[in-house]
C-alpha cells in the first residue's frame, strides 16, 4: 500500500492559483473569491486563461489546449501552494489525458474545486 503524501499546510503569503478548467466565469463573479483569498493573507494568481471564453456548444473558459495549459502551469509551478478552480461545469474529463503530474507528485498542493473538478481531484 502506498503512503499518502499530503500537501504542505498553507501559510500567509502563499500563492493560490485560480484557474478555470471547465466553464467560463465572469470577472465580477470571481471577485468575491479573490477578496476571500486576500483576506486570509494569501496571494491570488490568475491563470492566463482563467477569464477566457470559448464557445463550442458550451461556454468553456478556453480551448482544451488553453485550459490544460493553465492546469499544468498551476500543478507544476513551484511557487503555487494551492489551486482554486473558479467553477465547475463541463469539460474537465477531456483534460485528464494531457495532465503532466511528475512535478506535482513530488510537490503536491491543495486542489479546491467541486462538480466537474472532482474528476481531476480523483485522477
Residue ranges and their predicted role:
Residues 1-79:
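ATP/NTP phosphate-donor binding region
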Amino acid at each position: 500500500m502506498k503512503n499518502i503524501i499530503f500537501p504542505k499546510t498553507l501559510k500567509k503569503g502563499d500563492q493560490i492559483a485560480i484557474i478555470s478548467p471547465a466553464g467560463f466565469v465572469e470577472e465580477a463573479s470571481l471577485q468575491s473569491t479573490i477578496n476571500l483569498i486576500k483576506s486570509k493573507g494569501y496571494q491570488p494568481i490568475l491563470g492566463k486563461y482563467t477569464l477566457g471564453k470559448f464557445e463550442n456548444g458550451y461556454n468553456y473558459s478556453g480551448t482544451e489546449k488553453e485550459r490544460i495549459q493553465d492546469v499544468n502551469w498551476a500543478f507544476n509551478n513551484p511557487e503555487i501552494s494551492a489551486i482554486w478552480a473558479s467553477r465547475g461545469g463541463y469539460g474537465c474529463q477531456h483534460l485528464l489525458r494531457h495532465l503532466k503530474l511528475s512535478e506535482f507528485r513530488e510537490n503536491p498542493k491543495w486542489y479546491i474545486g467541486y462538480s466537474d473538478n472532482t474528476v481531476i481531484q480523483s485522477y
